[in-house]
A protein has these predicted regions:
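N-terminal secretory targeting modules
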Residues: 1-38, 42-51, 61-67, 99-100, ...
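Conserved SGNH/GDSL esterase-like catalytic core that processes O-acyl groups on lipids
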Residues: 32-36, 42-130
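Catalytic His-Asp segment of secreted/periplasmic serine-dependent ester chemistry enzymes
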Residues: 48, 150-237
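General small-molecule cofactor/ligand-binding pocket signal
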Residues: 71-73, 146, 189-191
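Alpha/beta-hydrolase-fold catalytic nucleophile elbow
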Residues: 108, 148-149
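Hydrophobic positions in alpha-helices of CheY-like receiver
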Residues: 132-136
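A short helix->loop->beta-strand "cap" motif at the edges of active sites that frequently abuts
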Residues: 139-144
Length: 237
């Protein structure tokens, strides 16, 4: 019985992932660089045991150290586009990320936009992404903007883990290309997580969509490299 229960835990976590979001309070500590990690379930750490310690923002915090404060503003199953079924910009997490007055914003959205019910066109996606960037840049002072392509998505191991059967795996590459264009057109820094994870099924959990601990670590390292490059050039953090 215990073995059966243990075997069922990943599936239970996967099922709950799309429907629950635990809000953790974020206190802004003065005298530090403030980095807001904005996103959906990938940023939230969906399906990760002890997600608040193992998701990529937590790993990034350990990589950067005490000079910066990293806060995650993420809600499962949310879309970048306001025309999607669950827009991120209508969430309290978005308002909190603005109130946080970040020095740097790292955005990782787009996977949920791949669903047929949410997708309009690459042009519409790029336009609404530019609007999100503009909203953050309207803050004073304007933060540095880093945007990430969605990571690669894979088929689940079996039907019990297929909680994301409306995600269009074949559309994720198109969205990744759209994000690259957005970065170039809007002067944002880019982290290409799609290229980083392409062909690396071992970096994802049973559902094929959410990174496991190794995948979250790889994402954090990629973001850290971009932030460190900016720092070496005299930027933040």
């Amino acid at each position: 019985m215990n073995l059966l229960l243990l075997a069922a835990l990943p599936a239970a976590a996967a099922v709950l992932c799309g429907y629950t979001t635990i809000r953790l309070p974020v206190g802004r500590k003065e005298g530090k660089e403030h980095i807001a990690c904005v996103g959906d379930s990938v940023t939230y750490g969906c399906t990760l045991p002890l997600f608040f310690l193992r998701r990529y923002p937590a790993v990034l915090q350990r990589l950067i150290g005490s000079d910066a404060q990293i806060a995650a503003f993420a809600v499962n199953d949310r879309t970048l586009q306001d025309t999607g079924n669950k827009p991120f910009r209508k969430e309290r997490a978005f308002r909190q990320s603005m109130e946080y007055r970040p020095d740097t914003v790292v955005i990782l959205l787009g996977t949920n936009d791949s669903k047929d019910s949410n997708w309009i066109s690459a042009e519409a996606f790029r336009r609404q992404y530019a609007e999100l960037i503009a909203a953050y840049r309207a803050l004073s002072p304007a933060p540095r903007i880093v945007i990430c392509t969605p990571p690669c998505a894979f088929k689940p191991f079996n039907r019990f883990f297929y909680i994301t059967n409306d995600t269009r795996l074949d559309r994720v590459p198109e969205i990744a290309e759209a994000v690259k264009t957005v970065a170039a057109e809007n002067g944002a820094e880019l982290v290409d997580l799609y290229a980083l994870t392409q062909g690396k099924r071992e970096l994802f959990g049973p559902d094929g969509l959410h990174p496991n601990a190794a995948g979250a670590k790889r994402i954090a390292e990629a973001v850290f490299r971009t932030l460190s490059k900016s720092s070496a050039q005299g930027g933040k953090p």
